[in-house]
């Protein structure tokens, strides 16, 4: 996409340096006029969150005050950093001197509540021990929902699909097996994308006769689909990030399976982060005239610091009676049932049905898109609304920052009641339980189950003081310890995603 194309939008917003400074204008993707029986909803999207939830919510409030509207949903595209207490910091793949508590712990403890429904995927800098409790997603705090390793859920009847983590070839074919305590390697592999997750997401594609629809409204990933710069102004991108060109040309920039996901699922919007630059692209789909699906509008956003383009507002049309709440997607639930045997919890390479291998797959079936009969079975589950009252604190909340609260051992791994309830309800394997049962070591009693005396007991002491230094950016996207990037994003405008 050339930056010379005309657009009707403003540049994406940066943060604010002080409480009295207005944010820069945000990009606003505006759909066609609302028809009878429709209403508009507004979704705020941010790139890497880096634990800066206070600043992100404050920026949203300023935008709302300036423009006279309210956001209905916030989407965060990874590096969310859901750190509950200082014990979670060793579970983050960040050098110890850069580990910082940030502000999520306030929302986990109940000191603050997210002012808007918040949805996020995982990146490569996460409190992985906590997220591993929720492989299929769940509430990490009141009003804040994690999508799990891969998921498709609905909001206002919009279908939102998400893929957590970043690509690494060495771990791509393995099942998910990591949980605390993490080895030095496992704390990195825990956030690596798995082929089984992408295989499940590809089953969201439409039936073979449907060539014109966009089955997914919004798709999220942390790193970029490999090859996406070819669909945008890549010359501009390579001027801004001079090391990206070599990675792109060698096929190392982003997830090499990402474009297949775009072509299979044809999302209307694809939102990403990770590379700390705002970049737009437009991916066309096959067809002509009225028989052609909408193109996929790709947008990656920056990190939340002053002057950087880290937030975008989407205006989307939905049905007048659409409920502004999260619900499970029937097709995704059926896919989880259909592919249940691919959940193993052990460190093994998975042979998927669409792979050529000398080893047999556990399934003879090749196509796991749900049949009409399988979807009827999902209907028997009843109401698919995601309950908002199922959150429970598994690790102790941090209620006061003291020296003793900093000097604690790494957090244990916990049985999460949300995972137990979801898997029992759907009738699928419970990866959280499988990981708990691997060994009794480093398995803790969930905080919500403890008596007050237990909760007030002094924890085992550790000599590590993690400190509160600001987080430094991740320095790459395809290796365990990537090299530093040389160039930085300046304040030029980028081309915004056009509307129809």
From Swiss-Prot:
Residues involved in a divalent metal cation 2 binding: 79, 124, 222, 274
Main location: nucleus
Basic and acidic residues bias locations: 472-500
GO cellular component, one term: nucleus
Subcellular location: Nucleus
Any Pfam family: DBR1
Biased composition (Acidic residues): 462-471
UniProt key word Cell inner membrane: no
Cofactor binding remark: Binds 2 divalent metal cations per subunit.
Cofactor(s) required, per the database record: Fe(2+); Zn(2+); Mn(2+)
Disordered, as annotated region: 1-25, 453-500
Segments for region (Lariat recognition loop): 164-194
UniProtKB keywords: Hydrolase, Iron, Manganese, Metal-binding, mRNA processing, Nucleus, Zinc
Binding site for a divalent metal cation 1: 48, 50, 276
Documented EC number(s): 3.1.4.-
Activity regulation text: Active in presence of diverse metals including Fe(2+), Zn(2+), Mn(2+). Binds two metal cations in two adjacent alpha and beta metal-binding pockets.
Presence of the UniProt keyword Cell wall biogenesis/degradation in the record: no
GO term, biological process aspect, one: mRNA splicing, via spliceosome
Molecular function (Gene Ontology), one example: metal ion binding
Domain of life: Eukaryota
Signal peptide: none
Function: Cleaves the 2'-5' phosphodiester linkage at the branch point of lariat intron pre-mRNAs after splicing and converts them into linear molecules that are subsequently degraded. It thereby facilitates ribonucleotide turnover.
Family statement drawn from the similarity comment of this UniProt entry: Belongs to the lariat debranching enzyme family.
Record's protein name: Lariat debranching enzyme
Organism field: Caenorhabditis elegans
Gene symbol of the encoding locus: dbr-1
């Amino acid at each position: 996409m050339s930056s010379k194309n005309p657009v009707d939008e403003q540049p994406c917003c940066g943060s604010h340096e002080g409480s009295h400074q207005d944010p820069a204008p945000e990009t606003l993707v505006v759909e066609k006029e609302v028809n009878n029986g429709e209403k508009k909803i507004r979704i705020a999207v941010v790139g890497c969150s880096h634990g800066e939830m206070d600043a992100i919510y404050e920026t949203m409030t300023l935008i709302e005050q300036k423009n006279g509207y309210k956001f209905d949903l916030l989407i965060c595209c990874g590096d969310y950093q859901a750190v509950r207490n200082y014990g979670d910091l060793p579970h983050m793949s960040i050098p110890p001197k850069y580990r910082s508590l940030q502000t999520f712990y306030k929302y986990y403890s109940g000191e603050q509540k997210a002012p808007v429904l918040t949805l996020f995927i995982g990146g490569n800098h996460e409190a992985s021990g906590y997220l591993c409790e929720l492989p299929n997603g769940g509430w990490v705090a009141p009003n804040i929902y994690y999508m799990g390793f891969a998921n498709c859920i609905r909001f206002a009847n919009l279908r939102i699909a998400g893929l957590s983590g970043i690509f690494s070839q060495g771990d791509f074919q393995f099942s998910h097996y990591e949980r605390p305590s993490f080895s030095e390697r496992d704390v990195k592999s825990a956030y690596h994308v798995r082929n089984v997750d992408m295989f499940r997401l590809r089953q969201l594609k439409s039936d073979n006769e449907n060539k014109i629809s966009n089955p997914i409204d919004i798709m999220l990933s942390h790193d970029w689909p490999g090859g996406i710069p070819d669909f945008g102004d890549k010359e501009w991108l390579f001027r801004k990030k001079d090391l990206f060109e070599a990675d792109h040309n060698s096929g190392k920039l982003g997830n090499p399976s990402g474009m297949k996901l775009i072509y299979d699922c044809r999302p209307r919007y694809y939102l990403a982060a990770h590379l700390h630059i705002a970049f737009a692209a437009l991916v066309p789909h096959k067809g002509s005239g009225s028989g052609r699906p909408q193109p996929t509008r790709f947008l990656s956003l920056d990190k939340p610091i002053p002057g950087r383009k880290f937030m975008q507002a989407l205006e989307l049309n939905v049905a007048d009676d659409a409920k502004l709440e999260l619900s499970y997607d029937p097709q995704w639930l059926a896919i989880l049932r259909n592919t249940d045997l691919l959940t193993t919890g052990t460190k093994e390479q998975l042979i998927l049905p669409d792979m050529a291998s000398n080893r047999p797959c556990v399934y003879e079936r090749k196509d796991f898109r749900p049949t009409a009969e399988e979807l009827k079975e999902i209907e028997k589950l009843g109401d698919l609304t995601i309950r908002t009252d199922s959150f429970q604190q598994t690790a102790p909340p941090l209620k006061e920052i003291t020296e003793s609260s900093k000097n604690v051992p790494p957090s244990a791994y916990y049985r999460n009641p949300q995972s137990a309830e979801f898997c029992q309800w759907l009738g699928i394997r419970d990866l959280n339980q499988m990981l708990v049962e691997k060994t009794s070591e480093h398995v803790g009693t969930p905080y919500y189950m403890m008596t007050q005396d237990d909760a007030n007991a002094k924890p085992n002491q550790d000599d590590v003081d993690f400190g509160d230094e600001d987080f430094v950016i991740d320095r790459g996207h395809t290796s365990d310890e990537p090299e530093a990037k040389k160039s930085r994003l300046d304040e030029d405008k980028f081309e915004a995603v056009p509307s129809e």
